[in-house]
Amino acid sequence: MYLTQNKLKFGIQNGLNVARAGYTEDQILTACILADKTGYDSIFYMDHTNVPQWKNATVLDPWVMLSAIAAVTQNVELGTCVTDAIRRHPSNIALAAISLDRVSKGRAILGIGAGEAQNLKEFCIPFEKPVSKWEEQIQVIHKLYDSTPDNIVSYDGKYYKLEGACLQAPPIRKPRPPTYMAAGGKRTLAMTGKLGDGWLPIGYTPVLFADHKAQIEKSMNENNRTQEEKDNFQFALDIDVYFSDDAEQSWAKMKEAVKVSLFKPEILRVHKLKEIEGFDFVKYFTEYSMSDQSWIVKMREAATQMPDDVARSSIALGTPEDIIPVFEEFMKAGVNHFVIRFWGKNYFGSIDKFATHVMPKLRETAKKQNN
């Protein structure tokens, strides 16, 4: 069953792929212009302070870069993938999203997650109660979207408070810039169904995506979301694509990184894999940082024990003919908005090749399945 009530969407992600390659700002903008002209629906930008595993990477502010991208594009939606909620006050995030929405003439998306230690530890920002803070953040942000001097808003949360607050720049997009939540656990998936307009995870197999999608839909029903909200909800996925003439050779290059990205308790659960002894997932996500890279070594050692067939189902490698079936499996699992990280030396060529040889066939597949 294909979930494509809405138009099937494709976007590009300027994330670790771009940071690691060291592309200049001009090169990134050129890639985004190409995506806008070749039929992509969205462009996303990662939000990190650093990437500890690659010391020579270039890491830029997403809101500044997305505003620059807005100035040179006309059609694509523009979003963060994803903003780190715990690092900023919700008023800053709300105003940044509104500002992007206005300069882009109504094309902004707020991709937001709870955060991770690597963006916080050396900056002495406490990584405490991130999920509870994230939930309050989204509630505050949504209130501030509707605020004006004549419609001041208040909020009395445990971590955030507003007392007659307002912003003075209403968003263009109605009812608001959509909120895509980066959820991956039982509690955050329920929050996504309650508060989100979309879901944007990373490191998923089709099996895990379908499982978590069902949890979100259950929460949407429990929270009495309207039919319109359900119909417009974006089940997005940050997915890796590596074009090459030899899929096996590409898999050999990407194998370790893919397993590290995929390695999480929920993957072990849905694929009925044994727990990896001696690895503490909670400590990894709360302690891994630039100053303590021992955790990435531990992660690599543990992740290599994951079966190849499970890991490989999460990534699209090889020729267009190799890649299309991978996307079709995710479409069956419920993805209706693909956010693609292109890997390899030819970023521009990959953007064009996907638009020319993959995108039309997937759109046709979705159209046939829904007729």
Put a short name on every predicted segment:
Residues 1-72, 76-77, 177:
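N-terminal beta1-alpha1-beta2 module of alpha/beta enzyme domains
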Residues 2-4, 131-170, 209-332, 363-371:
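An alpha-helical appendage that flanks or caps ligand/catalytic pockets
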Residues 10-14, 43-45, 78-80, 108-112, ...:
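Hydrophobic faces of well-ordered beta-strands that scaffold small-molecule active sites
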Residues 13-26, 83-90, 173-184, 241-244, ...:
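Active-site mouth loops of central-metabolism enzymes
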Residues 23-35, 96, 183-191, 319-329:
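Short, acidic/polar
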Residues 39, 47, 69, 100, ...:
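Conserved, mostly hydrophobic/aromatic
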Residues 42-65, 69, 84, 121, ...:
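Glycine-rich, proline-tolerant flexible connector loops at the mouths of alpha/beta enzymes
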Residues 56-79, 137-140, 144, 355-369:
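Alpha-helix-loop-beta-strand connector modules within alpha/beta enzyme cores
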